[in-house]
Amino acid sequence: MNQSTEAVTSIGILGAGSWGTALAILLARNGLEVRLWGREEEIARLSADRENRQFLPGIPFPDKLTPDATLSRVVECDEVMVVVPSQAFHEVLLQIAAIKPLQSLCWATKGLDPNTRRPLSIDAAAIFPGADLAVISGPTFAVEVAQGLPTAVTAASTSERYSERLAEALKGETFRAYTSTDIIGVQLGGAVKNVMAIAAGISDGLGFGANARAALITRGLAEITRLGVALGAYPETFMGLAGLGDLTLTCTDNKSRNRRMGLALAEGLTIEEARARIQQEVEGVHAAKETWFLSQELGVEMPITTEVYRILYEGLDPHVAVRELLHRRQRAE
């Protein structure tokens, strides 16, 4: 990788799930040479079909998109973007580091490090010291990006030059990336909104209505902001695309896996039964545990997160959880 302001001409996307594939399609349409990396059997299927029939059926790959199972070849691109679940993020970075040091790295993974319960940038900085780091986050459903529907995201990096370079690469006819220097806040917004989406799904699944959903979104935003500020993020970040934008989308639309997890839990399904129905990774299940422990460590009050954690990991009845939220002591907003 180089740190110049020259345009990106090639990019390696690590992770061939729905979001990684959608970003690969977007960037290839923008004219970049794209290599999409995943498991060998997965890549063989994508190469043969020239589409991701499992996650994005009916959306053909552009000519410039090449599925590739050879990591050493993929990381030779101008840029590398990691789009794997947060649970696999550390291991994938170690695999890259074993091949070559990077001067820059970006990711579109939404989650916290499962070992440290901190934003992924801290892990990335330890593995690639001195590298420019960036995260891409915002209100995005993979299928809509792949279909070319209008979308806006945030590209956050401590290097303004790097975030601008990525934003330019991502810019398309229907896709826009705004830049930010608040890499911590943008990551937290993308990770913790998944917990709130589970709560919104539970509330809607129990029939509590639109008023309750609006309250959950608003108070959920307050929780995310408190946690972010405690970790050094800017409060205004959470009013942007990676905060309020992503939170609103994920809490209100059934394309959201996390919202669907909440709906399934409200039906009485177990976590494993809900996962089997959704058939994709549900980041909010992990984020609930990591966020709850982090809030306890930092002394940040996060009542919605606490109730979601108790439902997922302590077997609390969702009806009881909602009652406990409503019966908390009176306080000023």
Model segments located where?
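Rossmann-like NAD(P)(H) cofactor-binding subdomain of soluble oxidoreductases
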Residues: 61, 67-150, 166-168
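NAD(P)+-binding Rossmann beta1-loop-alpha1 motif at the extreme N-terminus of oxidoreductases
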Residues: 1-59, 68-69
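Internal alpha-helical scaffold of NAD(P)-dependent oxidoreductase catalytic cores
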Residues: 123, 127-131, 150-237
